[in-house]
Each structure stands twice: as structure tokens, then as C-alpha cells.
A protein has these predicted regions:
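OB-fold and OB-like single-stranded nucleic-acid-recognition modules
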Residues: 1-259
Length: 259
């Protein structure tokens, strides 16, 4: 690979990073707080690509082999097979094209029902006491927050309150569905699902296609859908709490699909 192409690829990778982080597409992959770092990384790659391209153009008549030998300071005189070793790096640089193709051809969506259905961790124990819910009903609550309060606090802070939960439908083995939403700490690679089991569904919502986004308004009731009907949401990372449905509506996917 000639040095000009190396510089162009660096610029393209930087442009792709800037493109997805300038709008809201980056929220499908990382937390909102990562945006400044993405913008900085994209800008640095673009600058490095421009510098590499300018340097290649300045060299003009210098052959690719000579330029590479000068840059890497390879001195293997008399050693057989040096030529192949020297060109291993430039060949590997073609891998930088992959993220460009992924974003422009088959950009992956945010994690949804497929990932949630295969996740057995539904919550993690709170490290400290959770604050009371704000006044006023219904109160919007993150799905992960609802699960934590229902499981690890036995629903104490939810009792008698009407909550509003937003997530996507995940099919269950018995032909029903659960409301789920993925939670991330840093990026999609460390995501896990928070799921609740709606009970008392109206007939129109008995069967909902997977990945349909819904807002459920209702109240906490004791129970654990992961315990085969056993009473009580026992403190367990796999427990799936219940929510008694008061109303339900199909909604657009949020700009930020993660909790």
C-alpha cells in the first residue's frame, strides 16, 4: 500500500468517527458522555491522515520501498525474507477500511430483543440506598431503576406509586412478551438487559412483535417472572419483577435507546 493511500484511509476513518458522533448515531454504540472523546479522536485521525498525505506528496520521486525503509529504519542486510516482513504492516493497514464499510454499508443498530433474550443478568445490587422517587404520578422511571428497586429493595420505594416505563418487547418461551431495555456502563460491549413482566395486559397487547417500543404505565406488584410463579421478587440478579399495567402505548424508539 502506498503512503498516499495510508493517509487517505486514516482520514476516512476519522471522518466516519466524526460523522457518527456529530449527530446521535453514536448513541447506538456508546454512552452519551463518550461524545467529546469520539470527536477528539476523529479530529486527530483526520489531522494525522492529512499530515501523512502531505508527507507522501513531498517525497515525490522517492520510491515506496525507500520511503518505508527510511521510516521504519529497517537494516536487515543479508537476511533472507526481509522484503515480505517489511510489507506486513502496510497490508494490515487495509483492515482500517472495515469500519468504513460497516458504517456506510451495514451500520449495526442498537442492541435489542435478540441480545436481551439471551441475557440472564437482569440487575445488579445497589451499592447504596436509592433516593425516593420524585413526587407526582405517573413518574417516569428507567427500566433498570425499576428493576433495582423492585428486586433489591423489595419494592419499598415503588409501593403505591404509578410509574411510567419505556422499553422494547422481547418474546418469551410461553408465547408472551416482556418489556426490556439495555443498560450500558461504557459501550455496547458491556451491555446487559433489564426486563420486567407486564401483567394485566389489554387484549390488543397480548401479542406484540419483538423490538416494538412501548411505554407502560402501571404499578409495582410482588412477584418474580423468573421464579416459575413463586411469590415475591427475591433478591437475585436474574429476578424479573412484575408491573401491573394501567395503560400501554406504542412509542417511537428513543434517541438514546439505552438506560
Amino acid at each position: 500500500m502506498i503512503r498516499e493511500v495510508q493517509g487517505i484511509i486514516l482520514m476516512l476513518v476519522g471522518i466516519v468517527i466524526l460523522r457518527i458522533s456529530w449527530g446521535t448515531a453514536y448513541l447506538d454504540y456508546v454512552k452519551e458522555s463518550m461524545r467529546p472523546w469520539l470527536l477528539a479522536s476523529g479530529a486527530i485521525l483526520v489531522i494525522l491522515g492529512v499530515l501523512a498525505l502531505v508527507d507522501a506528496l513531498r517525497r515525490g520521486g522517492v520510491s515506496e520501498a525507500e520511503a518505508q525503509r527510511s521510516d521504519e529504519e529497517i537494516v536487515f542486510d543479508g537476511v533472507e525474507g526481509d522484503h515480505d516482513h517489511a510489507h506486513g504492516g502496510p497490508r494490515a493497514a487495509w483492515l482500517l477500511v472495515l469500519p468504513i464499510l460497516v458504517v456506510f454499508v451495514v451500520a449495526p443498530p442498537a442492541l435489542g430483543a435478540w441480545a436481551a433474550a439471551r441475557d440472564t443478568t437482569n440487575s445488579v445490587a445497589a451499592q447504596q440506598a436509592l433516593p425516593p422517587l420524585p413526587p407526582g404520578d405517573p413518574v417516569p422511571v428507567f427500566l433498570s431503576d425499576y428493576v433495582t428497586r423492585a428486586v433489591w429493595e423489595q419494592g419499598v420505594s415503588l409501593e403505591g406509586r404509578t410509574v411510567e416505563l419505556t422499553g422494547f418487547a422481547v418474546s418469551t418461551d410461553d408465547g408472551g412478551w416482556q418489556l426490556a431495555r439495555m443498560q450500558i456502563q461504557c459501550c455496547a460491549a458491556d451491555a446487559f438487559a433489564s426486563k420486567v413482566q407486564p401483567v394485566g395486559l389489554p387484549p390488543d397487547f397480548a401479542d406484540v412483535p419483538e423490538n416494538t417500543w412501548l411505554t407502560v404505565t402501571g404499578q409495582w406488584v410482588p412477584g418474580d417472572a423468573a421464579a416459575d410463579g413463586s411469590p415475591g421478587a427475591t433478591p437475585s440478579s436474574s429476578a424479573i419483577p412484575l408491573v401491573q399495567v394501567g395503560s400501554i402505548a406504542v412509542v417511537p424508539e428513543p434517541v438514546n435507546p439505552y438506560d
